[in-house]
Regions:
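Short glycine-rich anion-binding loops that position phosphate/pyrophosphate groups of nucleotides
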Residues: 9-12, 19, 87-88, 132-135
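Glycine-rich beta-alpha junction loops
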Residues: 50-52, 84-89, 116-118, 130-134, ...
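Buried hydrophobic packing segments
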Residues: 13-17, 63-66, 99, 203, ...
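General beta-strand structural signal in soluble alpha/beta enzymes
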Residues: 3-7, 46, 109-114, 129, ...
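Glycine/threonine-rich beta-strand-loop-alpha-helix active-site module
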Residues: 2-3, 7-58, 62
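Short glycine-rich or small-residue beta-strand-to-loop segments that form or flank ligand, phosphate
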Residues: 3-6, 44-51, 79-86, 190-194
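Glycine-rich phosphate/nucleotide-binding loop
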Residues: 18-45, 123-127, 131-226
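Glycine-rich phosphate/diphosphate-binding loop of Rossmann-like nucleotide-binding domains
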Residues: 52-116, 125-126
């Protein structure tokens, strides 16, 4: 298969994808999520949960996967950043500091570290991190958006229809399940995993994105970058 779209259970999808499709040589399968930044442009966050604790060298494969993904959806030179607790190269735990040095040596457009507060500002196209911190960032973005919008709706019960529609649009923008779902990268064909309660629109979005990845040679790009 050139690509797979499913709404099955996450664990089963991970195991079956690795067993049936096989892993790309030298890469650790990861979960990525395509979010929207404040300007409505794609922002790829990876890893989002497949690898809880990553060695510095694994960040290099994450960066290659993110670079290939963004190029496959039309970004000629995607900007890649490393999630940390400060923008300076010296910030972060030892694994992150070593990863920062390693990413600077790769043939990618690596901008350096990025703080969570800058994640959605539009200053980067790809955020690389381990699965533990990526999952926390993902759920924090979604949770804060829901909490803020819920409070606004409570404080503005008689808001005009246009305002209510705008709030609903913002809620959906920061809920990755409505944008499609998680993407398993690092196997021999990209796998997109939607939420079990995904709507028809979400499934359509996943199918269209998968078609774009396959038509633009995503897997071939990754294999070439990692040789």
């Amino acid at each position: 298969a050139a690509g797979v779209v499913t709404c099955g259970a996450t664990g089963a999808v991970l195991v079956c994808s690795i067993m049936l499709l096989g892993k790309l040589r030298g890469l650790r399968p990861i979960l990525a999520v395509e979010l929207k930044n404040a300007h409505g442009d794609p922002l790829l966050l990876l890893d989002c949960g497949a690898n809880i604790d990553s060695r510095p060298e694994l960040y290099a494969s994450f960066a290659h996967l993110g670079d290939a993904y963004m190029k496959s959806i039309g970004y000629e030179s995607p900007r890649i950043s490393l999630l940390s607790n400060g923008a300076e190269d010296t910030k972060g735990c030892e694994a992150v500091k070593e990863a920062n040095q390693l990413l600077h040596t790769l043939p990618i457009r690596f901008l350096g570290n990025i703080e969570p507060t800058a994640a959605l500002t539009g200053t980067t196209d790809v955020i690389v991190c381990d699965g533990f911190h990526g999952n926390i960032l993902l759920k924090s973005i979604e949770g804060v958006a829901k909490a803020v919008i819920a409070e606004l709706e409570e404080r503005l019960p008689d808001a005009p229809e246009a305002v209510r529609e705008a709030l609903s649009a913002v809620r959906e923008k920061y809920d990755y399940n409505t944008q499609g779902g998680a993407i398993l990268l690092g196997v021999k064909a990209p796998v997109m995993k939607g939420h079990g309660s995904a709507t028809g629109d979400a499934v359509t979005a996943m199918l269209l994105r998968m078609a774009t990845l396959c038509q633009n040679g995503f897997t071939e790009r990754v294999e070439a970058a990692c040789k």
